[in-house]
Amino acid sequence: MQVSYLHWKLKQEKNMLWLYFDKKDSSTNNIDQSVLTELMAIIRGIAKNKSIQGLIITSDKTTGLIVGADIQIISQLKTKKEILAFTRQGQSVFEELANLKIPTVALINGLCLGGGLELALACDYRIGLEDNKTRLGLPEIMLGIHPGWGGTVRLPRLLGAPRALELILTGRIMHPYAAAKLGLIDRVVPLRQAERAALYYASTKPWKRTRFSALNWRKLTNYSWVRNLISAIFRRRLIAKINPLHYPAPYAALHLWQQYGVAHKAFLQEAESLSKLAMTPTAEHLMRVFF
């Protein structure tokens, strides 16, 4: 079975569904409202289809999985209310993806940045292609904003706060082996092994860590009393390099995590914070420079 939408193509092979992103009339895959609307409909359809036992999301373009949100669209939104609505739309779609009862895999070829990585973080597994073009990161801070589709919540959950904050506050972009070393992706494979690896993970239920797991230190770093200590360290580093009056985004991201951690309510606060930052002169200037 193969079904096509405007921006997405679905291909079901037995009990596995391949979802290919190929944004219409665009050389790269970026995310706007129409992409999100289609993706929400697709995910809700998957949730109702009992014949689908695994989902693999990948790109049908050679330029990469997703380069992020459509910055031109964001720059055209004129009010905080409009930006908040767009941000919450993306959060809702990715939350639906994260809540699917089947294993979900992001097969990353080429660029996976910003909103693209946030989509991948909403999946159970991430596989990176062994390719010089494959890059991952959350570079929003370079545009005077911070991640807004769950990145400030899901990344600290996955990596622990120190590693996640370093990536969020610097906008660092990594090749797949560096990402795998951090725990951001589960496996790096050459192209010839990509399909086999994706199918393996899509048929594997996510491992549930026990309370005694050695990896529980990541959860510990997000506890409220630990957040204050970690925030103080990162704030000192920021003050040594960045004036908060001229460049407020990293301070806003750090404050957001310190106050709300990785609790579910942090998603709304993330959206509220981003919508304020996007209206600042710094963000408006950096987005103009981007084009």
For the regions a language model picked out, list residue spans one by one:
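Conserved CoA-thioester-binding segment of acyl-CoA-metabolizing enzymes
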Residues: M1-T58, E95
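Amphipathic alpha-helical segments at domain termini/boundaries
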Residues: Q2-D22, L121, I168-S273, M287-F291
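Hydrophobic/aromatic residues within transmembrane alpha-helices
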Residues: I57, D70, L119-A120, A179
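Glycine- (often His-adjacent) and acidic-residue-rich active-site loop
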Residues: S59-V93, C112, M142-G144
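Helix-capping/helix-break motifs at membrane-protein junctions
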Residues: T79, G160, P190-L191
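Hydrophobic, secondary-structure "cap" segments at the distal end of domains
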Residues: G151-P162
